[in-house]
Structure formats: C-alpha cells, structure tokens
Amino acid sequence: MKEVIDTVGRRKTSVARVFMTPGKGRVIINKLPVEEYFKDEVRRSKALRPLALTERTEEFDIKVNVQGGGITGQSGAVSLGIARALTEFDETVRPILKTEKLLTRDPRMVERKKFGRKKARKRFQFSKR
C-alpha cells in the first residue's frame, strides 16, 4: 500500500489536490484547519461528506491544496478529491460513494456571456414602440 495517496478533485473552476495519509483525522486545507477554511457548516459538511458516509473521519490525515473559483466550488472539489482518495485506499467503499454520487465530476460550468445580450441568456429590454 502507498504511504501517501494523492488525488485531484474539480468543480466549476476549482481544483483541489488531496494528499491522504493514515493518521488521526486532521484535515488541513491551504495550511488552515478545515473549521477555519470553511467557516460555513454547510460547505464544511459538503467537503467532508465522503469521510462521514464511510465512517472514516478518525482514520486519515488529509492535506488539501485548493485553488480557483469560490467557496462552493472549492468545497465540491475537495469532496470529490477525498472520495477518490478513499476509493484508491479501499475499493469496498466505492458502492457507498457511488450511490451518493460523490465519485461523479459535476460537469456544470458557468455559461458564457453572448454578444448582443446583457448576460448569457438575459436580453436587453425590448420596446415595441
């Protein structure tokens, strides 16, 4: 078995590199504890959901470098990275994570703005007269 498992998770424009080692359950994101980095409980629970579902919150030390996007995209990227690392460590957790759709890269991206319009789909106000 490898000592360090490293995986990549992506969501929107965020990229998270996850390094997982056997340990005591510490999660460090960009050199900050997860409680400090994701102050919002919703984003924190989203990021750590794979660990909670597989009941392995105390088994691994996880270091994450995450860049790009906002906090929602980053928490999704971290979640995917952790899920991939867990399956690389132990294939038996794959069905659990797969049923919860945690191993699927969310393909949704921001639609580009089109010329002649205010935003991607919104048009300028139309006046008949």
UniProtKB/Swiss-Prot annotation:
It comes from the Bacteria. InterPro entries: Ribosomal_Su5_D2-typ_SF, Ribosomal_uS9, Ribosomal_uS9_bac/plastid, Ribosomal_uS9_CS, Ribsml_uS5_D2-typ_fold_subgr. This is Small ribosomal subunit protein uS9. One of its GO terms (cellular component) is small ribosomal subunit. Keywords: Ribonucleoprotein, Ribosomal protein. Belongs to the universal ribosomal protein uS9 family. GO terms for molecular function: RNA binding; structural constituent of ribosome. SUPFAM superfamilies: Ribosomal protein S5 domain 2-like. Gene3D superfamilies: 3.30.230.10. It holds the Pfam family Ribosomal_S9. One of its GO terms (biological process) is translation.
